[in-house]
Amino acid sequence: MTPAQSQARAQLSDGRYVYCVVDTTSVPSASVGETTGIDDETVRVVSVDGVGAVVHDCTSVYDADDIDQVKRWLVTHQQVVDDVSDVFGTPLPMRFDTVFAGGDSALTDWLADTHPRLRTELDGFAGCWEYRVTLLWDPQPFEAHVTATDDTLQALEARQAEADAGTTFLLEKQYDARLAERRRARRSALASDLSAAVEPVATQVASQDTTTSLRDESVSERHTPIARLAVLAPETDESALGSQLDDIAARDGVTIRFTGPWPPYTFAPDICTDEPNQA
């Protein structure tokens, strides 16, 4: 983006910041509770034929060099989406900093133009929520078991006791490689088992990056996330989804983190891509 484009984006005389799209068929459009938006802005709903955009009025986009400020805005954005979910049911979350120029008239035009798709998406997600499942693994119990039962590892260990220094070094490398191979296989099996466990209950499943750390003092530092899934499922199946995880959670060294329900952040389509009214 050029400096001129950046300046044009930053200057809005009548912008609408959009948090999400909701089904207003059975709920009055003004019923957003006491929720306040980014920078304590008043949140309201602009609705067309039972499809509403949850918005606040703005005169600029939300762009800052201060990453902590951006994070605070993002947290508030998500909080608004979570709050209105309690009122309207499953929403279609919008990307952070989705701003339409042109006031309510431009926004209602967009809602009318995209109404068939929005209606279809809202109906498709109705009653379904996103759950997040993380499998954390402490390999020590597995390593203790495999070193005592793996024939190859035991043979390599026995040979080390009788070998000279040079040969011992090579045998140790072979031992470590074999143990790493068994460890990788176990990680892969656990990840596959997790996917298989949630599949019968899930409407959709998406794998997520495991590098984001989970801060939980109740989990040993030896535990590392080896699989993280976003699961879209009906809220009525929440208990069934949790039950599907019980067998895996009972395995040695395994801890399961199961959170939700959340709005379908992972699964909602990016409806506003290349929209002409978007700032």
Curated annotation (Swiss-Prot):
Keyword field: Gas vesicle, Plasmid
InterPro entries recorded: Gas_vesic_GvpL, GvpL/GvpF
UniProt cross-references to Pfam families, sorted A to Z: GvpL_GvpF
Compartment annotation: Gas vesicle
Cellular component terms per the entry's GO annotation: gas vesicle
Induction profile: In PHH4 (a deletion of the p-vac locus) transcribed in all growth phases, maximal expression in mid-stationary phase. An unstable 6kb transcript able to cover gvpD-gvpE-gvpF-gvpG-gvpH-gvpI-gvpJ-gvpK-gvpL-gvpM is detected, as well as smaller transcripts. Gas vesicles appear earlier when grown in static culture, possibly due to O(2)-limitation.
Signal peptide (residue range): none
GO biological process, one term: gas vesicle organization
TM helices/strands, residue ranges: none
Principal location class: other
Domain of life: Archaea
Miscellaneous comment text of the record: Encoded in a 14-gene locus called c-vac which produces cylindrical gas vesicles only in the stationary growth phase.
Assembly and oligomerization: GvpF to GvpM interact with each other in vitro, and may form multi-subunit complex(es). Interacts with GvpC, GvpN and GvpO.
Family of this protein: Belongs to the gas vesicle GvpF/GvpL family.
Function: Proteins GvpF to GvpM might be involved in nucleating gas vesicle formation. A minor component of the gas vesicle. Gas vesicles are hollow, gas filled proteinaceous nanostructures found in several microbial planktonic microorganisms. They allow positioning of halobacteria at the optimal depth for growth in the poorly aerated, shallow brine pools of their habitat. Expression of 2 c-vac DNA fragments containing 2 divergently transcribed regions (gvpE-gvpF-gvpG-gvpH-gvpI-gvpJ-gvpK-gvpL-gvpM and gvpA-gvpC-gvpN-gvpO) allows H.volcanii to produce gas vesicles.
The name this protein goes by in its record: Gas vesicle protein L2
